[in-house]
């Protein structure tokens, strides 16, 4: 089984502080642990994104916030794009 490396964009790294303040960091960490091992596993469901984020995926942290990530298969890496808000960049 492949375990993917995780990298964070600058925005995602800043989002971690917001998650901690909102007490959502444990839920986000559980999702990151899941996608590190199986990025396409359902449940929990994920959504393929379109437009500017085409090629990225989204999973719900809560009703307002999403984990947005890209799977870089060749590098065996998951790039975390955002952890806060609902696709507002």
PLM regions: where:
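Enriched for short, Lys/Arg-rich terminal
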Residues: 2-18, 22-29, 50, 59-66, ...
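A short, surface-exposed loop/turn module that caps and links secondary-structure elements
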Residues: 33-59
């Amino acid at each position: 089984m492949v375990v993917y490396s995780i990298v964070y964009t600058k925005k995602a790294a800043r989002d971690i502080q917001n998650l901690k303040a909102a007490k959502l960091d444990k839920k986000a960490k559980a999702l990151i642990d899941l996608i590190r091992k199986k990025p396409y596993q359902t449940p929990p469901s994920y959504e393929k994104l379109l437009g500017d984020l085409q090629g990225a995926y989204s999973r719900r942290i809560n009703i307002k916030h999403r984990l947005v990530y890209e799977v870089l298969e060749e590098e065996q890496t998951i790039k975390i794009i955002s952890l806060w808000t609902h696709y507002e960049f």
